[in-house]
Amino acid sequence: MTTPLTLENIRRAPKALLHDHLDGGLRPSTVLELAEQYGYDDLPAHDADELAEFFRTAAHSGSLVRYLEPFAHTVGVMQNHDALHRVARECVEDLADDNVVYAEIRFAPELHIDGGLSLDAVVEAVLAGFADGEKAAAAAGRTITVRCLVTAMRHAARSREIAALAIRFRDQGVVGFDIAGAEAGYPPSRHLDAFEYMRSNNARFTIHAGEAFGLPSIHEAIAFCGADRLGHGVRIVDDIDMDAEGGPKLGRLAALLRDKRIPFEMCPSSNVQTGAVASIAEHPFDRLARLRFRVTVNTDNRLMSDTTMSLEMLRLVEAFGYGWSDLERFTINAMKSAFISFPERLAIIDEVIKPRYAVLVG
């Protein structure tokens, strides 16, 4: 008998997460405690529920630039080893509680050095927190594998330095590189030296593109920079029209991305909040999924978007009528697209995802 698609049952399903920002997923209570512990005085609220409401309200801004503003508060309390370690550990525990079995968590080390830490020390603290979070999850009966992506801010000039950081820690849990931040005015091609460095070291990277800016951002990310994955990429629908018979007609860029199986790290709730799309029901996720693009489900920022992987999946189920087989396909899409080795990806798909979905399908 097929298990009903309720939130409680979706929570039981194994999940793979590729696009989640460490500084966008703190517990409100942790933000308060770290602020008090380390003397951060700029919080807009001093009650966990009120603070959570502040982040939710700020996220629903309709603008990527305004959506990013509240990160000053989370980054502000993540400026020493212990704070970074705690946030990383709790991140893993929270994901494991939602039955995420594989996650790639990204953050920008350059934003966490105001307290005197070196870039290397920042990464070391986060990786140690991830490792302790995995152990805590295992002790609670939940197995999760967490890896790290280091991100460079696209408005800054440290991307080559951050790419080198990714390579230094590639055997310690860092599996890739990313650029993030406001897209308009900061095209991916400004960071070609960083991407060339990653390619020259046979390393993987993703690029935030096609979220708040259009097709040129996606084109640069793929054609000039050589991205392995796209962060968001929702504006690819601008390259999909209708033919004379009313069927889909893919432009050359959209066709290339589908042909090459470029993964889309789609974050439905976040895209609504930033104004990239009007609603979940109008999100291009379903259109792309039906056209067999490699779409994946992601959270982006769990605190700001007040979301989990289970909630993101439920919202897609409610909007588009998906069944368990669809959720399994999206999960396998994510695992196929992960930046770990092929044997590791295959093991999680064959030994964890497929068997557990088989139970849910009945």
Curated annotation (Swiss-Prot):
GO terms for biological process: adenosine catabolic process; hypoxanthine salvage; inosine biosynthetic process; nucleotide metabolic process; purine ribonucleoside monophosphate biosynthetic process. Keywords: Hydrolase, Metal-binding, Nucleotide metabolism, Zinc. It is an enzyme of class 3 (hydrolase). Catalyzes the hydrolytic deamination of adenosine and 2-deoxyadenosine. The active site is at E211. This is Adenosine deaminase. Binds 1 zinc ion per subunit. Zn(2+) binds at H19, H21, H208, D300.
